[in-house]
Design a protein with these regions (language model features):
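A short helix-to-beta-strand connector/capping loop
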Residues: 33, 98-101, 152-154
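Aromatic/His-enriched, Gly/Pro-containing loop or helix-boundary segments
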Residues: 100, 104, 108
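A short N-terminal beta->alpha junction/helix N-cap motif
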Residues: 12, 33-41, 68-69
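Alpha/beta enzyme core
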Residues: 21-27, 43-68, 74-91, 95, ...
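N-terminal amphipathic/basic leader segments beginning at the initiator methionine
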Residues: 10-28
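Short, contiguous strand/loop micro-motifs
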Residues: 11-12, 36-37, 101-102, 132-133, ...
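Short, Lys/Arg-enriched N-terminal segments with co-localized hydrophobic residues
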Residues: 1-9
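Short catalytic-loop micro-motif centered on adjacent basic/acidic residues
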Residues: 35-39, 104-105, 127
Length: 200
C-alpha cells in the first residue's frame, strides 16, 4: 500500500514533457556545441528563455535553485514547467520550427531530501552539491542521490572543488581547485552523470 501511495504522488518529468540531460549531453558532445542552462525566477524570464531557444533551435536546461523552489512552491513549479513545454511547442509551430529538448534541473541542491522531492515533482535532472563536505562524505551523499535518481531515469550532476563566494545560498571563503585524480575516483564511486568542477 505504501509503495502504491508513493507512485501515486510522484509526477514523472516525462509526464510534463521534459527530457533528462543524458542524451542531451551525448548529442552536444558529438556535435561540438554547448547547451545553455538558465536559472529562472519569474514568468518573464522563462518566456524569454523559451522564445530565444526555440528561435535558435537550441536545447535548453531550465534551472531552479533551492531558494527559488521554496519561494515558488513545488506544486506551482510543476505547472510552470509544464506550461513552458507547451509554450515551446506552440511557439515552434507558429514559427514553423522543430520543438526543442528541454530539461528541468535542480541547481545546487544540498540534501538528499531536496533532491528526492524534486525528482518526485517532475524534475528531469538534479544537482547535489556536497562540495563543502569532506571528499568521502561528498561521495556518499552523491551516490545516495544517484541511486534514487537513476531508478526514475533522472540524471544527476555532482560537484568537486569550491569557488570562493556565494552561489545559491552555498557560501565559501576560499577556492579549492578540483584535483583530476579525485575526479576519477568520484565518478567511479558515485556513477554521477555530469560533474561541476572548480578550475579558477
Amino acid at each position: 500500500l505504501s509503495n502504491k501511495k508513493e507512485k501515486n504522488k510522484m509526477i514523472s518529468y516525462k509526464q510534463l514533457g521534459f527530457v533528462n540531460t543524458r542524451e542531451m549531453f551525448a548529442k552536444a558532445f558529438k556535435g561540438g556545441y554547448a547547451i545553455p542552462a538558465y536559472n529562472f525566477n519569474n514568468m518573464e524570464q522563462i518566456q524569454a528563455i523559451v522564445v530565444a531557444c526555440v528561435e535558435t533551435q537550441s536545447p535548453v536546461i531550465l534551472q531552479v535553485s533551492s531558494g527559488a523552489r521554496k519561494y515558488a512552491n513545488h506544486i506551482l513549479l510543476q505547472y510552470v514547467g509544464q506550461g513552458a513545454v507547451e509554450m515551446m511547442k506552440a511557439h515552434a509551430k507558429e514559427k514553423g520550427l522543430k520543438p526543442i529538448p528541454m530539461a528541468l534541473h535542480l541547481d545546487h541542491g544540498d540534501t538528499f531530501e531536496l533532491a528526492k522531492s524534486c525528482i518526485e515533482s517532475g524534475f528531469s535532472s538534479v544537482m547535489i552539491d556536497a562540495s563543502h563536505h569532506p571528499f568521502e562524505e561528498n561521495i556518499k551523499l552523491t551516490r545516495q542521490v544517484v541511486e534514487y535518481a537513476h531508478k526514475h531515469d533522472v540524471t544527476v550532476e555532482g560537484e568537486l572543488g569550491v569557488l570562493a563566494g556565494i552561489e545559491d545560498d552555498v557560501s565559501a571563503e576560499h577556492s579549492t581547485y578540483t584535483d583530476p585524480k579525485d575526479v576519477v575516483k568520484f565518478v567511479k564511486e558515485t556513477n554521477v552523470d555530469s560533474l561541476a568542477i572548480s578550475i579558477g
